[in-house]
Amino acid sequence: MRRRCSSPHRQVIEIGRRRLPADSRRKAIARFATGFAVLWLSLTWQISQPRAQIVSSPRELAIIRINVLDLLVHEQSLPLPVKQRRDALWEYYQEFGGELLWLGSRRPNELLARLQNAASDGLDPKDYPSKQLAGLAAAKSTDDKRSLALVELFFSAAFLEYASDIKVGRFLPRKIDPNFFIEGRTIDQTAALKSLAGVDSLDRFFSAWQPSNPRYAALRSALANYLALADKGGWGSVPLGEALKPGMKDPRVPAIRTRLKLSDGVGPSRVEPEIYDDALVDAVKRFQARQGLESDGVIGASTIVAMNVPLQERIQSIIMAMERLRWMPEDLGQQYVIVNIAGFDLRRINGGNVEE
């Protein structure tokens, strides 16, 4: 079972329409920072010395790798994120003769960028020790090989944490809802490290590593669009009123058009601005189908209410959908069924094709 931590502050984040303690990583990060502080005090002094050199030569890297193995075998006070992954780290660095992944490469900056932009993966950047890692990245110029070995292990531990969250989810399913009968999964951490060693960039690794379900990629793309909309201020509300049918004239039409321009890309009116024209009807039908409503093009109360759902709530729904897909088996087989309970909709997938 994957570890989940608690915090005395009991902060919460909203996942879909549920609320869950947002401290799943906070205590781990705090412990990470405690071990980091001791290392950082040592490294800060050493970086200030004129003899410090940036690690580059194969000989230096080989010496650091020896120190990595020694730490994993003999060090009893390893920081918690490293200690929890000691076996996998040992298996990679010793049994597979693993090369150093972080020192002498550009990967630390790539990992930092990924963690700081975790929102694009539907994850919370505050759940990851970016600031601590940034300090360690700056410490790569020290000539203390044992301290550099700890830097290597810190980055590997942080990478494995994020790789796990993207692959199998950051929360246990039953922590979200006790009625979810899905067992939490774990990743092969050694395999993740070996895969990372075989590619030239973290982006390439994560593109291949994230869930392969096409719906996941579609949700990630939609999330990027909605986050961009949020940065621009989101969308306004549409007033309720009488049902609006195709061809009718109504002062709410411009507001509806503006709303659907943001989410569905509908263009400007080719007739009078207040006329509910064919182009807008098509956009409304697409919107209704996506929301599980009857896609008849009639804008009634249910359609207006759906349009007025706050953007942040839509974003949280996408994030929750991405998390659920991470819980699912990687291979669903050639045939499976998707049920949309809210929309009273069932779809059979056969060989990648949707059968209504």
Ranges and model annotations:
Residues 1-28:
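N-terminal secretory signal peptides that target proteins for export/translocation
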Residues 18-21, 34, 47:
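Extended rod-forming repeat segments used as scaffolds/tethers
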Residues 25-26, 43-46:
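N-terminal twin-arginine translocation
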Residues 28, 39-40, 135:
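Local alpha-helix boundary/kink/capping signal
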Residues 33-44:
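Bacterial N-terminal signal peptides
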Residues 46-52:
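Sec/Tat signal peptide C-region and signal peptidase I cleavage site
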Residues 53-356:
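Auxiliary tRNA-acceptor-end handling modules of aminoacyl-tRNA synthetases
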